[in-house]
Amino acid sequence: MARYRCCLTHSRSRCRRRRRRRCRRRRRRFGRRRRRRVCCRRYTVVRCTRQ
């Protein structure tokens, strides 16, 4: 599986991996279709890069 890094607005210098535990709710709504672009809403996401 591919790993994604999300760059957050409150810490632009650092990119953190999205945490699945907090993203469970978002997962159910979108499913596999928009799974790649969607990250945790708690963080204000700027970019998600595939690595």
UniProtKB/Swiss-Prot annotation:
Keyword Disulfide bond part of the UniProt annotation: yes
InterPro entries, A to Z: Protamine_P1
Tissues where the protein occurs: Testis.
Entry's localization field: Nucleus; Chromosome
Keyword 4Fe-4S: no
GO MF annotation terms: DNA binding
UniProt GO BP: chromosome condensation; sperm DNA condensation
CC per GO annotation: nucleosome; nucleus
This protein's UniProt keywords: Chromosome, Developmental protein, Differentiation, Disulfide bond, DNA condensation, DNA-binding, Nucleosome core, Nucleus, Spermatogenesis
Disulfide bonds: C7-C15, C40-C48
Function: Protamines substitute for histones in the chromatin of sperm during the haploid phase of spermatogenesis. They compact sperm DNA into a highly condensed, stable and inactive complex.
Family per record: Belongs to the protamine P1 family.
Subunit comment: Cross-linked by interchain disulfide bonds around the DNA-helix.
Protein name per its UniProtKB record: Sperm protamine P1
Record organism: Capra hircus (Goat)
Gene designation: PRM1
